[in-house]
Amino acid sequence: MNIIEGAITAPHANVAIIVSRFNSFINDSLLSGALDALQRQGLVKESNITVVRCPGAYELPLLAQQLAKKGSYDAIIALGSVIRGGTPHFEYVAGECNKGLAQIALEHQIPVAFGVLTVDSIEQAIERAGTKMGNKGAEAALSALEMINVLAEIEP
């Protein structure tokens, strides 16, 4: 049996992080977690990390597409938070963001890590941005690094 697994270290990787400004009090914690994981666990050099900000989670797929088209990055990490309110807006934004990012990963054959919180309350967002439930930004960063290495193992 042949088992292919990817390491989480990728010292020569070029990584783009796209982060939404809306709900920045949450997203800045996700970004800090992602940067920490990339540098401390992934051994990625700070000079190999590009951070791009956008207005909200809905805009993340367009940024991811443009960065993927450049061909300069080994992975893209999308960070943001969509908090449910009293209108259907949550479903529209969360759904389109998710679908858009997944489509870009498939079309461009590049890891696009999904670090966008889709939660019912601010409390749930805070829990997932570095308190009780860990930091989903760090988890997305580690997922991106692992996928870089897994894809390198299976490419012809």
Curated annotation (Swiss-Prot):
Keyword DNA repair: no
UniProt-listed Pfam families: DMRL_synthase (PF00885)
GO cellular component term of the entry, any: cytosol
One Gene Ontology term of the molecular function aspect: 6,7-dimethyl-8-ribityllumazine synthase activity
Catalytic activity, reaction form: (2S)-2-hydroxy-3-oxobutyl phosphate + 5-amino-6-(D-ribitylamino)uracil = 6,7-dimethyl-8-(1-D-ribityl)lumazine + phosphate + 2 H2O + H(+)
Membrane found in the keyword field: no
Pathway, per record: Cofactor biosynthesis; riboflavin biosynthesis; riboflavin from 2-hydroxy-3-oxobutyl phosphate and 5-amino-6-(D-ribitylamino)uracil: step 1/2
Binding site for (2S)-2-hydroxy-3-oxobutyl phosphate: G86, T87, R128
Keywords: Riboflavin biosynthesis, Transferase
A single GO BP: riboflavin biosynthetic process
InterPro entries assigned to the protein according to its UniProt record, in alphabetical order: LS, LS/RS, LS/RS_sf
PANTHER family: 6,7-DIMETHYL-8-RIBITYLLUMAZINE SYNTHASE (PTHR21058:SF0), 6,7-DIMETHYL-8-RIBITYLLUMAZINE SYNTHASE DMRL SYNTHASE LUMAZINE SYNTHASE (PTHR21058)
Role of this protein: Catalyzes the formation of 6,7-dimethyl-8-ribityllumazine by condensation of 5-amino-6-(D-ribitylamino)uracil with 3,4-dihydroxy-2-butanone 4-phosphate. This is the penultimate step in the biosynthesis of riboflavin.
Quaternary context: Forms an icosahedral capsid composed of 60 subunits, arranged as a dodecamer of pentamers.
Family: Belongs to the DMRL synthase family.
Name this protein carries in UniProt: 6,7-dimethyl-8-ribityllumazine synthase
This protein's encoding gene: ribH
